[in-house]
């Protein structure tokens, strides 16, 4: 009798979970203008495609992007890679004693070697590690054993991720932004054979050979959570650096480099976008609400822009408690007009939604926050975009697109 009841119960459970996993109907809604993705820029005989990845909250070690990079490489058919990566310990050119994290560079190519991707992975956790150590006692056995197991896991997650946005609002923000600017500097200073390896070194913008690389190479940023704020703030810091000779006046900024940067269109792929939340309590950028003046070729300040266009592709899972879409008007009011930003919002369920035994639908909020970089649809959108002739078949089948026009 007991055995029969157990079998009956097991059968009900198996049928329930099979129903949950039968079909993947998770949300994928794209609202905005078409975007190309990475793929078309690999076919660039004059230069290289270069991507910088910036992580978000939580302690990260070099190599954190490995799984995402492998999926991206597969989607782009880049089956050849350098035997070893290159590593640079980042420093501030005005204060070499500052430890600004690690930059790891990967080189990937296709089988015929005529397409190449240089992937730069920034790890800035070193900057905040000392301050976050204040909470390390709370993860020790002295305190953690008193918690229920699941609550202990949640508390450790909170201790790991919660402090970073708070720390970023303090003095460490300056060093994190210098770390971003240093990473961008290394992106435009040299191809693979010229990149230093296993060195502690600062980068400067005074090498005129970087001007031609900036003109011929293609660039993109990929970020997660707080990394999106860091990327935008880093670009706004570049805008200030190139426009204000009194800001860090000891460093050169050749006008040829500024002019080359003004011709670039750079996309930012933001996973678990947090720009609206991280704008709370902050001062507005130096120049806002003047996109027409700075971005229209007929605008009065068009020669003073920092980029020709910044395409923001913002991924957000509605069940991610720490992610937000970018609402209409946010760009004009809260982003520096000199970036000439435009936004495409992507609402996408990266966490599966379950029927919680009739109590309502449920998605794991932790999975919804950290699952973007392993989701095949996210990778396919970054690799091949939408609204073009090379869009992935999976995206055409599983994502809807509402195009917006000016």
What are these regions (language model features)?
Residues 33-39:
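A short loop-to-beta-strand scaffold at the N-terminal edge of the catalytic core in hydrolase folds
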Residues 13, 56-58, 112, 121-128, ...:
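Lipolytic serine-hydrolase domain surface
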Residues 2-4:
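C-terminal motif of bacterial Sec signal peptides marking the signal peptidase cleavage site
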Residues 43-145, 234, 238-242:
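Short, surface-exposed "cap/lid" segments of acyl-processing enzymes
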Residues 80, 192-196, 390, 394:
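Residue-level signal for secondary-structure boundary elements
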């Amino acid at each position: 009798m007991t055995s029969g009841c157990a079998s009956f119960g097991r059968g009900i459970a198996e049928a329930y979970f099979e129903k949950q996993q039968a079909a993947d109907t998770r949300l994928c809604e794209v609202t905005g203008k078409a975007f190309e993705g990475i793929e078309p820029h690999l076919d660039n005989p004059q230069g290289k495609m270069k991507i910088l990845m910036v992580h978000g909250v939580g302690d990260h070690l070099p190599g954190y992007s490995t799984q995402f990079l492998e999926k991206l490489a597969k989607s782009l058919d880049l089956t050849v890679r350098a035997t070893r990566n290159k590593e640079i310990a980042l420093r501030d050119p005005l204060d070499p004693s500052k430890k600004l994290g690690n930059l790891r560079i990967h080189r990937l190519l296709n089988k015929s070697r005529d397409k190449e991707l240089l992937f730069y992975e920034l790890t800035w956790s070193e900057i905040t590690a000392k301050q976050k150590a204040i909470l390390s006692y709370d993860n020790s056995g002295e305190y953690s054993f008193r918690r229920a197991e699941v609550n202990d896991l949640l508390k450790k997650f909170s201790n790991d991720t919660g402090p970073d946005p708070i720390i970023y609002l303090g003095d460490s923000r300056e060093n994190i932004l210098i770390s971003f600017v240093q990473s961008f500097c290394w992106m435009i200073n040299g191809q693979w054979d010229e990149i230093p390896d296993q060195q502690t070194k600062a980068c400067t913008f005074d090498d005129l050979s970087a001007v031609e690389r900036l003109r011929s190479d293609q660039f993109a940023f990929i970020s997660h959570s707080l990394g999106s704020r860091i990327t935008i703030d880093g670009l706004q810091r570049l805008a200030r650096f190139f426009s204000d000779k009194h800001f860090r006046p000891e460093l050169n900024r050749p006008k040829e480099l500024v002019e080359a940067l003004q011709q670039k269109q750079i996309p930012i792929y933001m996973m678990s976008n947090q720009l609206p939340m991280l704008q709370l309590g902050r001062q507005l950028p130096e120049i806002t609400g003047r996109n027409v003046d700075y971005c229209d070729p007929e605008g009065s300040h068009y020669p003073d822009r920092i980029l020709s266009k910044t395409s923001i592709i913002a991924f957000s899972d509605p069940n991610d408690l720490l992610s937000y879409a970018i609402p209409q008007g946010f760009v004009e009011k809260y982003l520096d007009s000199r970036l000439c930003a435009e936004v495409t919002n992507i609402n996408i369920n990266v966490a599966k939604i379950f029927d919680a035994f009739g109590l309502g639908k449920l998605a794991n909020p932790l999975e919804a926050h950290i699952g973007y970089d392993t989701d095949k649809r996210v990778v396919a959108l970054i690799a091949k975009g939408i609204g073009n002739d090379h869009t992935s078949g999976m995206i055409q089948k599983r994502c809807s697109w509402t195009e917006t026009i000016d």
